[in-house]
């Protein structure tokens, strides 16, 4: 949902939009809670409070001040990610298609012939990093830029087996227009750009697990982050290949040689980072035109020193000349060298051309070896061709996508490779490598071993759920790692499936109860964003490829109502209750009935079950932003710091009742996942609370009334406010609690309206208005380690007779309390108090 804050109402009516007027009788937290549970996507918030907006944003719900109709229209017509700390809106708005344009944030693409393959009459527009060049389009009170681009389509095309770009583009745009927005993927770059600077400000040693190409620019400013990926393809791996011949397959209709060079350089930079943890100088031989340097410099400042007879417009220092073997001594330490020398073929006969290429390959290798032989902190990426060749067995082979699959590939060499064993590789094996293997990641670091690292902060986004990892090892890592942000795929199946298909692999699935954590927050993508200064206008879908975000060692753990909080906890319930359910009271009725409480009078105001826990369980797919286990645990240890809102402290038994209701709901819905989740949450409640039951009680608390509006034949009709199992020396403690609660007990507004047979030969009257006081009393006794209440549901009633009677219905009648007493069962009254 998105909350757009206005000082004045607007005449225009928008679809899926609701107006909320700030309620001055409630504080900012309660207003935020009420807003978060509204069911429309767009909320126009009038007479707004800035503090309420802040509360919503910290909860991950995008809430933006709007000063004009232009701002309102821009935000209401699309989704966005909001940097609420810096007041920047990142739109995810594809309405630019109506200008017959596609967009890119990569400059090199604009220098290709891609426009020849666009839809008829369409153009390509460069919008800069995260759309920053579009800021001039929006003269708003907040900074605004449109981060939507079509780079995902272009990159997917490059890695696909399809050649017809126009058809591919058309199909993908039609898909985009007919499917829900992949909001998490679109906002992820904004998130990473906030996440890693904030982590690096606090933690010196950071590990990042499983980065992919979409993060290739994110980490350029963080050379000390240790990356782990799927490892490199090295020369010794070619032993498994059978020899093949030249294929000559075209990969892309437009020229992507620039993209290939950029990927080679970025791969080399990250390889260097993992060895030396600092930024290198980048030397390039055969550099022209390297328009992609502009893209890298948009993200991070590097020194590019280049050699080529042709211009290299974006290099820092350019030598418009050839580079020879004798020039190697010009290259300094702490650098990477990219050798991309290849003479243009022009009209040369292919046999003659082949000789030239092989000579240049040998020359390129000689330059690489000479460069690496002296000095320190050096890495080289060198262009090679398929030919009979000796290479170090540990050399890293690269084959990033290029316009045509021909004879070209690259190798990354470091100072250790050149002193390692070399292996002779025949030309046909290199062709087999070129023809069959495409390097699909600029991160070629070794795989991560699933072991905790006490001195490091571990980030693993979308990296550990794959079933080639041991599920238990993933759980152990998360349980043991003190400082981390790790995601795992949430089990949002209905059959409690332990793993699910994703593309061509399988992912393990997880529930919050799979982990045993303290000082950790388990939330959704939205909830995680709120913890790092961002909010989002569209929540994750309840089904599909969604993840739990587990933040270990966060200083926000005890800020229960600020982050990963109960905002939107009832939103799904409201959507159901006020649309398709039998009555808007359905949830209240079901919760009482499923716990054998048949007095439904006032069920919506006096419910016997925690609605928070019940909704968090049965609708967990919609509201797992709320960290239920953390909420339960902090209540159990009495460390709930609440800044505002209408706070009600649940008795532990209310939480148990909620689990029982959720369990019955799951059985009726055939939802095996909720069934397990409810069972495990109940187990967790029993683990963190020391709940004891007076199932064999020896004392009870009774309430005597001035008068009863029914006939009775018991000596003194009374309401049993609860039973206890105590030793006689604990009577004083019980009396102390009753005295503390005296005012509240006598203020309890108890009423009755009918009689019924509670069981055979037990005729009783109902008593409404009791439960809230009962649960408060329960909490007081619990904190004082006094066993109070039974394991079965407490049903307030007034015993009238021990024989069968006809039921009676009367107008609801208020009962005046005469006295409250503590009596031994089948014994004497040991304490009595009157108002």
Swiss-Prot record:
Positions of transmembrane segments: none
Keywords, in A-Z order: GTP-binding, Host-virus interaction, Hydrolase, Inhibition of host innate immune response by virus, Methyltransferase, mRNA capping, mRNA processing, Multifunctional enzyme, Nucleotide-binding, Nucleotidyltransferase, RNA-binding, S-adenosyl-L-methionine, Transferase, Viral immunoevasion, Virion
EC number: 3.1.4.-, 2.7.7.50, 2.1.1.56
Record's protein name: Protein VP3
Catalytic activity as recorded in UniProt: a 5'-end diphospho-ribonucleoside in mRNA + GTP + H(+) = a 5'-end (5'-triphosphoguanosine)-ribonucleoside in mRNA + diphosphate; a 5'-end (5'-triphosphoguanosine)-ribonucleoside in mRNA + S-adenosyl-L-methionine = a 5'-end (N(7)-methyl 5'-triphosphoguanosine)-ribonucleoside in mRNA + S-adenosyl-L-homocysteine; 5'-triphosphoadenylyl-(2'->5')-adenylyl-(2'->5')-adenosine + 2 H2O = 2 AMP + ATP + 2 H(+)
Source organism of this protein record: Rotavirus A (isolate RVA/Human/United States/WI61/1983/G9P1A[8])
Role description: Multifunctional enzyme involved in mRNA capping. Catalyzes the formation of the 5' cap structure on the viral plus-strand transcripts. Specifically binds to GTP and displays guanylyltransferase and methyltransferase activities. Has affinity for ssRNA but not for dsRNA. Capping activity is non-specific and caps RNAs that initiate with either a G or an A residue. Together with VP1 polymerase, forms a VP1-VP3 complex positioned near the channels situated at each of the five-fold vertices of the core.
Compartment(s) of residence: Virion
Gene Ontology molecular-function annotations: GTP binding; hydrolase activity; mRNA 5'-cap (guanine-N7-)-methyltransferase activity; mRNA guanylyltransferase activity; RNA binding
Pfam families to which the protein is assigned, alphabetical: Rotavirus_VP3
HAMAP family attached to this UniProt entry: Rota_VP3, Rota_VP3_A
Region of interest called N7-methyltransferase activity, as start-end residue ranges on this chain: 171-245, 429-555
Stretches for region 2'-5'-phosphodiesterase activity: 693-835
């Amino acid at each position: 949902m998105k909350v757009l804050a206005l000082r004045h109402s607007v005449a225009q009516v928008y679809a899926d939009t609701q107006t909320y007027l700030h309620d001055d009788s409630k504080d900012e937290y309660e207003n935020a809670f009420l807003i978060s549970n509204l069911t429309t996507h767009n909320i126009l918030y009038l007479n707004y409070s800035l503090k309420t907006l802040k509360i919503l944003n910290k909860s991950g719900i995008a809430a933006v001040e709007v000063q004009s109709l232009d701002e309102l229209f821009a935000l209401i017509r699309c989704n966005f990610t909001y940097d609420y700390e810096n007041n920047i809106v990142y739109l995810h708005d594809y309405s630019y298609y109506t200008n017959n344009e596609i967009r890119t944030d990569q400059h090199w693409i604009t220098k290709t012939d891609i426009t020849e393959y666009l839809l008829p009459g369409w153009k390509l527009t460069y919008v800069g990093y995260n759309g920053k060049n579009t800021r001039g389009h929006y003269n708003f009170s907040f900074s605004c830029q449109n981060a939507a681009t079509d780079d995902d389509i272009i990159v997917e095309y490059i890695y696909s087996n399809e050649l017809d770009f126009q058809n591919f583009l058309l199909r993908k745009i039609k898909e985009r227009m007919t499917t829900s927005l992949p909001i998490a993927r679109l906002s992820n770059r904004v998130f990473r750009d906030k996440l890693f600077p904030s982590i690096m400000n606090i933690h010196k040693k950071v590990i990042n697990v499983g980065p992919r190409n979409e993060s290739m620019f994110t980490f350029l400013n963080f050379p000390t982050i240790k990356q782990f990926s799927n490892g490199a393809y090295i020369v010794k791996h070619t032993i498994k290949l059978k020899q093949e011949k030249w294929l000559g397959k075209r990969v892309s209709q437009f020229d992507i040689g620039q993209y290939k060079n950029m990927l080679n350089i970025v791969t080399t930079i990250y390889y260097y980072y993992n060895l030396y943890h600092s930024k290198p100088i980048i030397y390039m031989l055969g550099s022209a035109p390297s328009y992609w340097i502009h893209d890298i410099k948009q993200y991070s400042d590097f020194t590019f020193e280049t050699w080529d007879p042709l211009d290299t417009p974006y290099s820092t220092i350019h030598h418009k000349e050839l580079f020879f073997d004798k020039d190697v001594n010009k290259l300094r330490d702490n650098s990477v060298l990219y050798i991309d020398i290849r003479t243009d073929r022009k009209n040369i006969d292919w046999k003659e051309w082949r000789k030239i290429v092989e000579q240049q390959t040998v020359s390129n290798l000689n330059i690489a070896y000479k460069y690496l032989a002296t000095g320190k902190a050096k890495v080289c990426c060198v262009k090679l061709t398929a030919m009979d060749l000796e290479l170090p067995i540990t050399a890293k082979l690269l084959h990033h996508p290029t316009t045509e699959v021909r004879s070209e590939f690259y190798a990354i060499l470091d100072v250790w490779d050149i002193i390692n064993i070399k292996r002779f590789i025949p030309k046909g094996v290199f062709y087999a490598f070129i023809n069959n293997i495409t390097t699909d990641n600029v991160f070629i670091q070794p795989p991560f071993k699933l072991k905790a690292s006490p001195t490091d902060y571990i980030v693993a986004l979308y990296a550990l759920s794959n079933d080639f990892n041991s599920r238990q090892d993933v759980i152990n890592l998360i349980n043991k790692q003190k400082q981390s942000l790790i995601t795992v795929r949430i089990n949002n199946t209905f059959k409690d499936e332990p793993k699910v298909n994703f593309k061509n692999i399988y992912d393990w699935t997880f529930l919050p109860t799979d982990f045993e954590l303290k000082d950790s927050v388990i939330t959704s993508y939205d909830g995680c964003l709120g913890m790092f200064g961002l909010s989002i206008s569209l929540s994750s879908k309840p089904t599909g490829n969604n993840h739990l975000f587990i933040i270990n060692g966060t200083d926000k753990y005890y800020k229960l109502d600020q982050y990963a909080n109960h905002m939107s906890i009832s939103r799904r319930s409201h959507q159901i209750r006020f649309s398709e359910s039998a009555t808007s009271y359905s949830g209240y009725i079901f919760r009482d009935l499923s716990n054998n409480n048949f007095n439904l009078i006032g069920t919506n105001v006096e419910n016997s079950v925690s609605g928070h826990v019940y909704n968090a369980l049965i609708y967990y797919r919609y509201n797992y932003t709320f960290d239920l286990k953390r909420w339960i645990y902090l209540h159990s240890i009495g460390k709930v710091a609440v800044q505002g809102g209408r706070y009600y402290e649940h008795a532990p038994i209310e939480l148990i009742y909620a689990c029982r209701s959720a369990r019955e709901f799951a059985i009726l819905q055939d939802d095996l996942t909720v069934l397990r989740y409810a069972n495990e949450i109940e187990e967790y409640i029993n683990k963190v609370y020391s709940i004891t039951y007076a199932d064999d009680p020896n004392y009870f608390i009774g309430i005597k009334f001035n008068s009863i509006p029914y006939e009775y034949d018991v000596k003194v009709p009374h309401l049993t406010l609860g039973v206890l199992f105590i030793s006689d020396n604990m009577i004083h403690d019980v009396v102390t609690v009753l005295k503390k609660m005296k005012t509240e007990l006598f203020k309890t507004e108890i009423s009755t309206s009918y009689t019924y047979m509670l069981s055979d030969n037990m005729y009783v009257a109902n008593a409404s208005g009791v439960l809230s006081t009962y649960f408060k009393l329960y909490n007081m006794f619990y904190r004082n380690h006094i066993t109070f209440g039974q394991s079965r549901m407490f049903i307030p009633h007034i015993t009238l007779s021990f024989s069968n009677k006809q039921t009676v219905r009367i107008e609801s009648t208020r009962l005046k309390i005469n006295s409250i007493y503590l009596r031994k069962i089948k014994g004497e009254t040991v304490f009595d108090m009157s108002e």
